[in-house]
């Protein structure tokens, strides 16, 4: 992608024009180019560019795009420090002010660079920071598949990979993109090994709490397979997660014994109870195609007058599909999502698909025999 230049002249003259412009705006910079070459000129121009950020947006973008265009023609080994310096200025300058301009400038730099240049990591992290500061994360690319590709293309170290994913996670949370944030956190935790899983203790703890707090999250068994989460075995947070994965209303006893712990997590008991009732109902619906109102009252610890309202709310989550039979005071289940999906569920899925395959073959053979007659 080409980046618009400040003026269509040689690099040296362009640097001189930039120096003169910045000088005219009050910057402490010489109008004469440095004898050290273009990269030294750019270092001094970037250092003094604060003054132009105060100008009209169109002028600023033109000037800064000129800086970007000069940066992009430097040798890669001379680019990195200068790009880091420019990014730092754009992230920190009057933090919170003129976010759309700063995003545009960083985006121009990011998309103007070679796709495999490792220093794009710095620019992308800066984009995330600025977008998060103004609630504009939707205006930058955050799709997990694309981020994975960049991590590979840039050949990031493990530390930088973790930094990027953690930064992206926090930005998505701040911008209330909970579904995307959860996927990024799972990606982050999944990137740890047994050797460094202990380093992700805080992230694992945060991931569990956010998942339990999310009103639209009901399946948690995948979290138990993550190495940093396994590292928390024996702690209350892991016990709580295990209850939400497969237990019924064992949560009630856990809460009675650990009320202060639940409160310290910022979790609300009533919301936890509502979620546990739904999870318990999902488990019941997997095992039974018909469930009496009396059984539901007993298992879910709800009153007779609350059964129908509970079922309606459960169906709205799309985790359970069922009908209410008021005459016989029962619920007829057509489908329920499994709370855990292990070897047994994979076998059931295989058997179902295999049965469909055999039935389709029978239909095919029947049609072929009819066409032959």
From Swiss-Prot:
Keywords: Acetylation, Cytoplasm, Initiation factor, Phosphoprotein, Protein biosynthesis
Family statement drawn from the similarity comment of this UniProt entry: Belongs to the eIF-3 subunit M family.
Residues spanning the signal sequence: none
Function: Component of the eukaryotic translation initiation factor 3 (eIF-3) complex, which is required for several steps in the initiation of protein synthesis. The eIF-3 complex associates with the 40S ribosome and facilitates the recruitment of eIF-1, eIF-1A, eIF-2:GTP:methionyl-tRNAi and eIF-5 to form the 43S pre-initiation complex (43S PIC). The eIF-3 complex stimulates mRNA recruitment to the 43S PIC and scanning of the mRNA for AUG recognition.
Any single GO BP term: formation of cytoplasmic translation initiation complex
Post-translational modification N6-acetyllysine, affected residues: 253
Classification via SMART domains: PINT
Protein name, as recorded: Eukaryotic translation initiation factor 3 subunit M
Location relative to the cell: Cytoplasm
Location (main, coarse): cytoplasm
Annotated GO CC locations: eukaryotic 43S preinitiation complex; eukaryotic 48S preinitiation complex; eukaryotic translation initiation factor 3 complex; eukaryotic translation initiation factor 3 complex, eIF3m
Pfam families cross-referenced by the UniProt entry: eIF3m_C_helix, PCI
HAMAP family associated with the record: eIF3m
GO molecular function per UniProt: translation initiation factor activity
Subunit and partners: Component of the eukaryotic translation initiation factor 3 (eIF-3) complex, which is composed of 13 subunits: EIF3A, EIF3B, EIF3C, EIF3D, EIF3E, EIF3F, EIF3G, EIF3H, EIF3I, EIF3J, EIF3K, EIF3L and EIF3M. The eIF-3 complex appears to include 3 stable modules: module A is composed of EIF3A, EIF3B, EIF3G and EIF3I; module B is composed of EIF3F, EIF3H, and EIF3M; and module C is composed of EIF3C, EIF3D, EIF3E, EIF3K and EIF3L. EIF3C of module C binds EIF3B of module A and EIF3H of module B, thereby linking the three modules. EIF3J is a labile subunit that binds to the eIF-3 complex via EIF3B.
Residues annotated as domain PCI: 180-338
Phosphoserine: residues carrying this PTM: 2, 152, 366
In-chain residues carrying the UniProt-annotated modification N-acetylserine: 2
């Amino acid at each position: 992608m080409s980046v618009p230049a400040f003026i269509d002249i040689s690099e040296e003259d362009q640097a001189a024009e930039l120096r003169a412009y910045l000088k005219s705006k009050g910057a402490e910079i010489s109008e004469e180019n440095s004898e050290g070459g273009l990269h030294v000129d750019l270092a001094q121009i970037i250092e003094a560019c604060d003054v132009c950020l105060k100008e009209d947006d169109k002028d600023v973008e033109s000037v800064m795009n000129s800086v970007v265009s000069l940066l992009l023609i430097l040798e890669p080994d001379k680019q990195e420090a200068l790009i880091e310096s420019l990014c730092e200025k754009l992230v920190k300058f009057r933090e919170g002010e003129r976010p759309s301009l700063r995003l545009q400038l960083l985006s121009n730099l990011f998309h103007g660079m070679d796709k495999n240049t490792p220093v794009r990591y710095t620019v992308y992290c800066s984009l995330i920071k600025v977008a998060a500061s103004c609630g504009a994360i939707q205006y930058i690319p955050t799709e997990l598949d694309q981020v994975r590709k960049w991590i590979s293309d840039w050949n990031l170290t493990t530390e930088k990979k973790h930094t990027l994913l953690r930064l992206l996670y926090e930005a998505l949370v701040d911008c209330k993109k909970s579904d995307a944030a959860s996927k990024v956190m799972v990606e982050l935790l999944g990137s740890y090994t047994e050797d460094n899983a202990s380093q992700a203790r805080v992230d694992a703890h945060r991931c569990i709490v956010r998942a339990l707090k999310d009103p639209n999250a009901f399946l948690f068994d995948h979290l138990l397979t993550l190495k940093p989460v396994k590292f928390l075995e024996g702690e209350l947070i892991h016990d709580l997660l295990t209850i939400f994965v497969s237990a019924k209303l064992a949560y009630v006893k856990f809460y009675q014994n650990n009320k202060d712990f639940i409160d310290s997590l910022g979790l609300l008991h009533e919301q936890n109870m509502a979620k546990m009732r739904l999870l318990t109902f999902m488990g019941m619906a997997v095992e039974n195609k018909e469930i009496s109102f009396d059984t539901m009252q007993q298992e879910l610890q709800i009153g007779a007058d609350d059964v129908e309202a509970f079922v309606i709310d459960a169906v709205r989550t799309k985790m359970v599909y069922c009908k209410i039979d008021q005459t016989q005071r029962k619920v007829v289940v057509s489908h329920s999502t499994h709370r855990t999906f292990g070897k047994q569920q994979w076998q059931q899925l295989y058997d179902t698909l295999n049965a469909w395959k055999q039935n389709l073959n029978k239909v095919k053979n029947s049609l072929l025999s009819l066409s032959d007659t």
